[in-house]
Amino acid sequence: IIVTDTGSTDRTKELASRYADKVLDFAWIDDFSAARNFCAQHASNNWILSLDCDEYVNSIDVKTMRILMQKFPRYTGVIRLKNLVLDEDGQTGYGTDDVTRFYNKNFYTFDYPIHEQVCSKDMAKREEMMQCFLLPMEVVHHGYALTPEEMQDKQRRNLSLLYKNLERNPDDSYTLFQIGQSEFILGNHEKAVTFYERGLAGDPSPEFIYVQVMIISLAKAYVKVGREKEALALMDRYAGRCRTAK
């Protein structure tokens, strides 16, 4: 177990040192991928399970994981993340996300400064779908159990990093998608439409999950700004290529 601390001011390091093999310091540079990759570099094994401090493992089948690692050495592992959320009345609920967090560091690395993604180290393969298996484990995430005010603050933080990355990569569809998501949550639906449209302008493959989400999100944003006909036209356009559009 390796814990990378990016500047905590509480007892995080003290508590982590009771359980971790290594507790490392990493100066925060507005880049979550850089912190994750720094941590992975110090691992003695090649297979990496990357978790955040607001996540915990609720259950795990290590025996099955080992079998999957041996059978599919170049695959990545997907966690079904159980997100703890608060509704408008402050009641607790759960949503789920499938996220790639298990990988062999010989072949894969994290990319993007925020909403970081496991990507192939071979740049020529970046546009290909990664092969993956579902990990036999449940991980609970507390990072979205926020009040509306806290959620808005988090989205503004996210946007500051996303816009910086967009300056470096102005046509990156994933970054454009994530900006659209944050603007939508903040209630800036016209802005969200603009960024979703830009994200789809390069015709990224709907085989990627984020593209499917972007299509549906754009349709919802169209409805929010009174452009229902365009929402229907969008669904028709992607019906044959995107299962969520059907």
Regions found by a protein language model. Name each.
Residues D5-E14, W28, D52-E55:
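A conserved acidic beta->alpha catalytic loop
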Residues E14-F38, H42:
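Conserved donor nucleotide-binding strand/loop of the catalytic core
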Residues A34-A40, V57-T194:
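Catalytic-site signature of metal-activated, phosphate-bearing donor transferases
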Residues I48:
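Short aromatic/hydrophobic "clamp" motif used to bind/position activated sugar donors
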Residues N165-N169, L200-V213, R241-K246:
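Flexible helix-coil transition and linker loops at the boundaries of alpha-helical arrays
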